[in-house]
Amino acid sequence: DCKYGYDIHDGVMRLTLLRSPTFPNAADKGYHEFTYSFLPHKGTYREGQVQKHAYELNNPLEVIWGRGEKKETGCGSLIQCQTEGIFIETLKLAEDGNGYIARAYEGFGTRKKAEIVLMPGYKVSECNMLETDDTEIATDKNRFFTVFKPFEIKTFRITCKNIKC
């Protein structure tokens, strides 16, 4: 949803829901829906896990019912991060059709060693944002470690280890 902002002055909180100028064109006229949330918490935004709660609000979990037989154990996700403050922001098909692209970033402004887990049967390489210059990353039990600088964005290519994926 990401609307326009907020301000706090003299103990009064205000939320700007819509900015709709009429010049040069009637940009935002029409029907609008808003989702907003107040998250009281103690301590810093890190201690209050504000980014985590924001993701949960803007990307609610969807349950899809079905039947199937679990054949292999794993993390349940193609990729997931085990390190607080590292966020996997994007997962998409690679532009060249060779695997998937995951983008992750460090969101707390600190240097961090991240532990990332892959679903069994996949391998990973780090590439640039244009999805070129791949450098394969060694995994151990479907896990790998990488160091993020403050606010750094990293791009990973995830592909099958063999043709059966």
Q: Where do the language-model regions lie?
A:
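Terminal accessory/anchoring regions of large secretory-pathway or extracellular enzymes
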Residues: 1-165
